[in-house]
Design a protein with these regions (language model features):
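Extended, low-hydrophobicity, polar/charged segments
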Residues: 1-185, 192-201
């Protein structure tokens, strides 16, 4: 049985423009035992979070040559290929052949396939090397006390909310949604050992 670490996993997406029209397909490839980090993928594509979703595989197949669970980085066309930065350093991997019930073995980056974008798009696991310092990553529970949603021009375009740039040209306002959880922030502070005892706060 083949170890998942020796396989390439494909995830297929469709992207949209600011008006909600389909704007091309994306095939993201990661090591078989890894999980995709959508935030990293969105940043790599330089698009907004709302501008991408999983593709209708049958529809995408007609346009790009992908085949459901048998999609690999070879024989794809008319789509952007994003390869996780871990894959180029791995040798002799197994990947889908874009043909039902068929796979390729001994796949190597550069010789057999390439990506339009090669960047870190995986979710780090406990024990993985930190991409900044190299130390093993350790997971810990946290409390979300704030959040940001990048809305881009999703609402400003249809609302015609424009501003004048330095050339006096109308440009859509880039919007965001920002939240701070005041009550949960206080709760998190109180939960810290130095901020409460058996008598309370």
């Amino acid at each position: 049985k083949l170890d998942k670490k020796q396989t390439i996993k494909a995830l297929l997406f469709v992207t949209y423009d600011a008006l909600g029209n389909e704007n091309g397909y994306v095939a993201a490839f990661i090591r078989g035992d890894r999980e995709l980090n959508m935030t990293k993928l969105v940043n790599a594509l330089n698009i907004n979070e709302y501008a991408i979703e999983f593709a209708d595989e049958e529809k995408m197949s007609k346009a790009t040559g992908c085949v459901g669970g048998f999609t690999g980085p070879m024989h794809l066309h008319d789509c952007k290929i994003v390869v996780d930065s871990e894959l180029p350093g791995l040798k002799n991997l197994c990947a889908g052949a874009c043909e039902t019930d068929h796979h390729y073995i001994n796949m190597n980056y550069g010789r057999d396939y390439e990506g339009d974008i090669v960047v870190d798009i995986k979710t780090l696991k406990e024990g993985d090397a930190c991409p900044i310092c190299g130390a093993p990553v350790r997971h810990a529970r946290g409390v979300e006390v704030g959040q940001i949603f990048k809305l881009g021009t999703k609402y400003s375009e249809p609302m015609k909310a424009y501003y004048k740039d330095e050339n006096q040209q109308d440009k859509p306002i880039w919007m965001g949604c920002y939240g701070i959880g005041v009550s949960r922030t206080f709760q998190a502070i109180i939960d810290m050992p130095q901020n409460h005892d058996e008598n309370g706060i």
